[in-house]
From Swiss-Prot:
Pathway: Carbohydrate biosynthesis; gluconeogenesis. This is Fructose-1,6-bisphosphatase class 1. Its main location: cytoplasm. Substrate binds at residues 110-113, 199, 265. Belongs to the FBPase class 1 family. It comes from Neisseria meningitidis serogroup B (strain ATCC BAA-335 / MC58). One of its GO terms (molecular function) is magnesium ion binding. The keyword Hydrolase applies. Binds 2 magnesium ions per subunit. Homotetramer. HAMAP family: FBPase_class1 (MF_01855). It comes from the Bacteria. The lineage of its organism: Bacteria, Pseudomonadati, Pseudomonadota, Betaproteobacteria, Neisseriales. It is found in: Cytoplasm. GO terms for cellular component: cytoplasm; cytosol.
Amino acid sequence: MDTLTRFLPEHLQQNQLPEALGGVLLSVVSACTEINAKVRLGALAGVLGMAGTGNIQGEDQKKLDVIANNIMIDTLKANSAVAGLASEEEDTFVNAGENGRYLVLFDPLDGSSNIDVNISVGTIFSILEKPEGALATESFLQTGRQQLAAGYVLYGPQTQLVFTFGHGVYMFTLNAENEFVLTKENPKVPESTKEFAINMSNRRHWLPPVQQYIDELLAGETGTRGKNYNMRWVASMVAEIHRILMRGGVFMYPQDKRDPAKPGKLRLMYEANPMSLILEQAGASASNAYQAMLDIQPENLHQRVAVFMGSSEEVAYLDRLHAK
């Protein structure tokens, strides 16, 4: 089986991609391998619990949020091909190499509310080309279609790296020697599914199309959908999307009525865009219920969006309900 270091040069050459772009991916992987070691030790390393700080979104940070964020920043700044960074945990962008060609955006530890109870978490990342001119916030505000690469690392029973350069999706598993080994090529998400993932406790706050959709799923084979559905909810986007990649399903984090000014909870740049690129490469769909996720023009680094992604039949049906 191919290791990442053997696979990557050949993949880059086959698809006429720059070696430096592969080097940025390897820097991300190096950082994630270090984060994995911290996650694995947990309480033994004294990294669990709250950090006593908050991020720009007003969320309390876990110790591992801060540790993972610092590891990502330090590792990526050491790569001269990286011009700038943007993190869910930072107020604004971070300057890196003066002559760098690439921008890296990331959620250093997705699902960190699960850390203290030993449930799967992960790191999500996106790589963009730096536009000409001085680095500014606007440099990062590119649509998801402009991503050069996207991926995530799942820290679960196995530690797995999943990424795409826009030429298929590849999955690698970390072995005992701390090497990522290719374990699956080009997974395809089934068009139809019988699984959905949503936080049902928020049902009373959802907009009518989402309430209708969930009611139809819960009605099962005697309802309009004509089949029984199972619900899943891990509260870790990386874990949810990984399951969908492996066996299908639809993941939803809709807008709700509590704060009309907030179109959703998840971040377009750090979570929705990279996951959408991966899923589209695997034959799935992703939208905010009104347009394809990858076509949304970002307005700010920390922009939030409603998220519907997974098996294409379900995402298309949700889009139709919202269009009524």
